[in-house]
Amino acid sequence: MQAKSEIGITTMKQEVNPQDTSRAKAFGLWIKSPMPMVTFTKTFDVTRLYKVCKRRGVKFNTLLCWCMGRAATRQRVFYLLPEGEKLYKYDRLAINVIVNHKKGDICSCDVPYSDDFYQFAADYDRMTQTAIDTCESSFDEEAMIIGTSAMTATQLDSIVNQYSGVFNNPFLAWGRYRKSWFKVWLPISMQFHHAQMDGGHAAQYLEDLQQIINHL
């Protein structure tokens, strides 16, 4: 479960001129929109992911989050993010994971994406356990964050309207997976800022995610 990133990237977070990027037109159209977020929902065949987790003793959500990060490395738009009325370029990605801490509330941590799954899994376990124990969130300001939320208390068909007006990051959310005969299914909702990417980018991302799961 190792793969080499296909993206040529810079060395640090930096502000860029939107007009010098492929997002110039979209940035002008959407950066001041009162509701610039779009949500897609796709039902994934996660049978392969489920079997790999069972066979190797890997946590389902850990491997799923790694696959999400892996799919994002295939598109340059994931290394751009609008903040306020500016556009920033990043050199790396991280996955935000929400956990229930010991005081009964929630907090989160930004787990750095690595092409090496086992490195990612080690960071995931360490950072989520620290968040649970300390009841404090940790943030990586130098990475483009892919938000996630696993609400596994029930099965969910779709999750929408997560826009806060503060966080413009791509956000993926899901409920409990569903078993049907010899298949395991999981609807996943993806919210994205239209200044960062178009619907075609998001659709391709979801397709890439399915293919990565299929080839674990």
Where are these regions (language model features)?
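Acyl-group handling in specialized metabolite and lipid biosynthesis
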Residues: V38-T41, L49-R56, G104-Y118, M197
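Helical lid/core segments from catalytic subdomains that handle acyl or acyl-like groups
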Residues: H101-L156
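Acyl activation and transfer enzymes in specialized metabolism, enriched
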Residues: L49-R74, L186-Y205
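Active-site loop/lid in soluble adenylation, ligation, and acyl-transfer enzymes
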Residues: L63-C65, G69-L81, L87, G104, ...
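Histidine-centered acyl-transfer/condensation active-site motif
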Residues: D140-Q155, P170-E207
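Gly/Ser/Thr-rich phosphate-binding loops and adjoining beta-strand/alpha-helix segments
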Residues: E6-T10, V16-Q19, I31-L63, Y79-I95, ...
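Domain-scale detector for complete catalytic domains at protein termini or as standalone homologs
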Residues: A3-M35, T47-V52, G69, L81-E85, ...
